[in-house]
Design a protein with these regions (language model features):
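C-terminal motif of bacterial Sec signal peptides marking the signal peptidase cleavage site
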Residues: 15-18
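Low-complexity, intrinsically disordered Gly/Pro/Thr-rich segments
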Residues: 83-97
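N-terminal glycine/threonine-rich, aromatic-flanked beta-hairpin/loop signature
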Residues: 38-83
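Short, linear, compositionally biased motifs with a strong N-terminal bias
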Residues: 10-13
Length: 112
């Protein structure tokens, strides 16, 4: 009986994880692979987000659906397992390079 409950919960979690909101047209500049030496952020057009950061010797990572934008900031995850990414500088072009500042970290779009 417990196995069936666990299996049902796992299926529900997988189903909900695929329920991200697509990136709205006015935020399409957020889509892409962003990175610095200590942070990696992938935002896909369909609303999937992958994040990894090394800070103070601790690695934090997260994968989940995009829940939406609040101004320049965006929310990722489900319920209590969600996080708000604070964007102090939304995507902008500096010469040939696209940049964005998320959670105080300057990120570059594209391979480094």
């Amino acid at each position: 009986m417990n196995f069936i409950k666990i299996l049902a919960l796992a299926v529900l979690v997988l189903f909900l994880a695929g329920c991200g909101k697509p990136v709205p047209p006015d935020k399409v500049s957020y889509v892409g692979e962003w990175q610095s030496k200590t942070m990696y952020l992938l935002i896909t057009q369909d609303g999937s987000v992958r994040y990894k950061r090394l800070k103070g010797g601790v690695t934090t990572s997260m994968e989940g659906p995009l829940q939406g934008f609040s101004g320049d900031n965006f929310d990722v995850g489900l319920g209590p397992m969600s996080s708000t990414f604070v964007v102090s500088k939304p995507p902008y072009q500096d010469g040939a390079q696209w940049k964005m500042v998320v959670d105080g970290e300057e990120l570059l779009r594209g391979a480094q």
